[in-house]
């Protein structure tokens, strides 16, 4: 209940209600099942505007890795394109990370989403504070922070380092390349549901498509490129690499 009230207070329900957005939802059989839809409905979207998949309980997560990456969200991508939805939102199995599919059915890099959310928090929600990000997270966040004269702190790998900074109360946002987002007005930890809701809110408040928001963003900031490659390794291979 407390978590529900916090999330409800974090987004502009009036803007979302008036937007008439059509949203695709994929909890990947995980902890956000039911909650993503509930928050959208409580924010004013009509049930017929919300298209959801994988809300049933499946302890095998559809026999896929439920990490909200491009491979896991192929069905959400098809759903968005088929039904001509404005955006697709998803969470990983324990709902602490997010995944976003644009209106063209393309998966959007977490690095890009994190920078867009920061710009949204500052420009549309008028929030202030410092920003912290892990060492592997894109410096695109620095571009946004510097443009608004906000301090940026780089942390080692591991969200616990960001947690500690968020607990000081001096930081507006904590960001991690692996789709981890923390915002000062919420709990000082990753929250995938809130991250998804902030993207929907951003579109509603700006009254623009995601594609238009992204194009306008890159008129102001330089393009940054990043790519993540996951390699399956045996325990022996991991041990060998760690020794090096």
Predicted regions and their residues:
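Short acidic, glycine/serine/threonine-rich loops at helix termini
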Residues: 34-39, 62-66, 98-103, 141-147, ...
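Phosphate-binding and adjacent anionic-ligand microenvironments
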Residues: 87, 127-244
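Alpha-helix capping and helix-loop boundary segments enriched in small/acidic/polar residues
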Residues: 27, 63-68, 105-109, 132, ...
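Short, acidic/turn-prone active-site loops that include or flank metal/cofactor-
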Residues: 54-58, 112-115, 156-161, 179
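Gly/Ser/Thr-enriched, mixed-charge loops and adjacent short helices
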Residues: 1-81
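Buried hydrophobic positions in well-ordered alpha/beta secondary-structure cores of metabolic enzymes
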Residues: 7-10, 26, 73-77, 89, ...
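General beta-strand structural signal in soluble alpha/beta enzymes
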Residues: 25, 52-54, 90-91, 100, ...
């Amino acid at each position: 209940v407390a978590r529900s009230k916090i999330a409800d207070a974090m987004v502009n329900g009036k803007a979302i209600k008036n937007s008439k957005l059509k949203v695709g939802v994929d909890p990947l059989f995980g902890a956000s099942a039911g909650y993503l839809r509930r928050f959208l409905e409580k924010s004013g979207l009509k049930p017929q505007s919300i298209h959801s998949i994988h809300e049933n309980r499946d302890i095998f997560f559809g026999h896929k890795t439920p990490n909200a990456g491009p491979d896991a969200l192929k069905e959400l991508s098809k759903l968005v394109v088929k039904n001509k939805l404005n955006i697709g939102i998803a969470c990983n199995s324990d709902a602490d990370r997010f995944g976003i599919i644009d209106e063209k059915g393309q998966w959007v890099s977490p690095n890009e989403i994190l920078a867009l959310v920061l710009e949204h928090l500052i420009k549309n929600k008028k929030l202030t504070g410092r920003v912290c990000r892990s060492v592997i997270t894109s410096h695109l966040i620095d571009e946004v922070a510097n443009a608004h004269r906000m301090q940026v702190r780089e942390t080692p790998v591991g969200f616990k380092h960001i947690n500690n900074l968020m607990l000081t109360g001096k930081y507006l946002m904590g960001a991690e390349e692996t789709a981890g987002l923390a915002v000062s007005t919420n709990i000082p930890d990753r929250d995938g549901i809130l991250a998804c809701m902030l993207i929907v809110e951003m579109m509603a408040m700006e009254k623009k498509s995601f594609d238009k928001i992204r194009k306008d963003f890159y008129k102001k900031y330089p393009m940054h490129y990043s790519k993540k490659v996951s390699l399956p390794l045996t325990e022996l291979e991991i041990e060998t690499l760690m020794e090096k």
